A protein has these predicted regions:
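Selective transmembrane-helix segments that form parts of the transport pathway or gating/packing helices
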Residues: 90-120
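Extracellular/periplasmic helix-loop-helix junctions in multi-pass membrane proteins
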Residues: 178-194
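Transmembrane helix boundary and interhelical loop/hinge segments in multi-pass membrane proteins
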Residues: 16, 50-52, 66-86, 100
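A structural motif at transmembrane helix-loop-helix junctions in multipass membrane proteins
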Residues: 138-170
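Hydrophobic alpha-helical transmembrane segments of multi-pass membrane transport/permease proteins
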Residues: 15-42, 52-66, 108, 165-178, ...
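Membrane-interfacial helix-loop-helix connectors in multipass membrane proteins
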Residues: 40-51, 114-138, 142, 185
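N-terminal Sec/SRP start-transfer signal
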Residues: 1-22, 213-215
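Junction motif at the cytosolic side of a transmembrane helix
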Residues: 154, 198-215
């Protein structure tokens, strides 16, 4: 593969998949939610409750991009390997966007798998609820990844990056929950939310890259 950005992204993804401490937070929330569905809740739920539970399942996974993003740059700086990374014979943009690209595949795949599993075990698969929940999970992953990456570039340790990023995650989780009724009720709401999230993600990514390039 000749594209350096894709090579860096694939290397980062392989590192993520080799690290159980990064994978376990992605796996536990949907498993626990599905088990609670099977043991505590009734098999048949009204669509209103099911939509909230499926959205909750997606939102439990998406913040797990925070430790990945925190380790991307703050972790590299803490291990004194960021300077070595910048000495690679590739453009800074390839390093930055390769690392950014590597943050998304694992959580996005797990959002789809967990939402599908939850819908299956709930005994009430409604495609309209499924795709909207998956889409909300995707948007939350992009949102949390962009903000966490910016924080990771602004602090010196991965722990500090995690702690600061979780404040933003808490605020955004409240916003997603508050808008859930509007999101599921209005047909064009997902597309409006997508425009906002991708505009935010693009702006934060551009500012983060400038910060990375300027050191």
């Amino acid at each position: 593969m000749k594209n350096p950005m894709l090579r860096i992204a694939l290397h980062e993804i392989r590192q993520i998949l080799r690290e159980p401490r990064f994978l376990l937070p992605f796996l536990f929330p949907p498993v626990l939610l599905i088990l609670s569905q099977m043991t505590l809740l009734s098999a048949e739920m009204p669509p209103e409750i099911l939509s909230r539970m499926m959205l909750f399942c997606a939102l439990l996974i998406s913040p797990m991009t925070v430790p990945l993003a925190s380790d991307s740059f703050a972790g590299e700086r803490e291990r004194s390997s960021l300077e070595l990374l910048l000495l690679l014979p590739v453009r800074p943009s390839a390093i930055f966007y390769g690392k950014l690209l590597a943050l998304l595949p694992v959580p996005l795949v797990l959002v789809v798998l967990s939402e599908t599993a939850y819908a299956f075990f709930s005994g009430c698969f409604l495609f309209s609820l499924w795709w909207k929940s998956v889409f909300a999970g995707f948007l939350a992953c992009f949102c949390f990844s962009g903000i966490s990456l910016f924080v990771s570039l602004s602090v010196k340790t991965a722990r500090a990056a995690n702690q600061i990023s979780l404040v933003f995650v808490f605020i955004l989780m409240i916003a997603f929950a508050a808008l859930s009724d509007f999101y599921f009720r209005i047909s064009w709401a997902p597309f409006l939310l997508a425009l906002f999230v991708f505009a935010l993600f693009s702006a934060v990514s551009a500012v983060s890259f400038r910060k990375f390039r300027n050191g």
